[in-house]
A protein has these predicted regions:
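Conserved acidic functional residues
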Residues: 1
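Hydrophobic/aromatic-rich transmembrane helices and adjacent perimembrane loops
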Residues: 107-156, 168
Length: 178
């Protein structure tokens, strides 16, 4: 998406998207499905153990995607639960909430965020386990963009030198990362 909409290179964007989808399919339906049988037995639903975490939305990929389109109220109600809303501060606090000021970078993590927040497995939306690790690079990139934006805006509003404002933004980030 970034290559298509920001860089405006549709060929590269399509190539990266295709490679990503192919890798997702191989990893999810091949590698993980094969090795999950060692630990869970033959419990895969339509090819992947992960679909069991979305049975409240449907039994497989098609029915899950259909639920997202045909039952938006139920999906939004799920996303608005206290446990899932608590996920956001756990993801944003380590970067001083600055990623909220870099929404494009954070939006690139939408598939990962959706997978975590729509699951019925609490470890995926707790923000405390490895499931959230894939969001970290996007949160950091969003924080960098957010810090740059905030530095420019505060310097313009106050007339302070950018270096002074940036030092304050860095102190803010450091305080939140401790």
């Amino acid at each position: 998406l970034y290559l298509v909409f920001v860089v405006r290179d549709r060929k590269a964007g399509a190539a990266v998207a295709a490679a990503g989808l192919i890798w997702f399919a191989v990893a999810t339906f091949g590698i993980i499905a094969h090795h999950s049988r060692q630990f869970y037995g033959d419990v895969a639903v339509e090819g992947s153990i992960y679909f069991k975490r979305y049975t409240h939305l449907g039994g497989g990929l098609g029915s899950i995607l259909q639920a997202l389109v045909t039952r938006p109220g139920e999906v939004l109600a799920l996303l608005a639960t206290e446990e899932r809303l608590a996920y956001w501060p756990r993801i944003l606090a380590p970067v001083g909430f600055l990623a909220a000021l870099g929404p494009l970078e954070l939006a690139l993590a939408a598939p990962i965020l959706a997978a975590n927040l729509l699951a019925d497995y609490p470890a995926m939306y707790s923000g405390e386990y490895h499931y959230s690790a894939l969001v970290v690079p996007f949160a950091v990139a969003g924080a960098v963009t957010g810090a740059a934006w905030l530095t420019r805006k505060v310097a313009a509003w106050t007339g302070w030198p950018r270096a002074r404002v940036l030092a304050g933004v860095c102190a803010w980030l450091l305080a939140w990362s401790l």
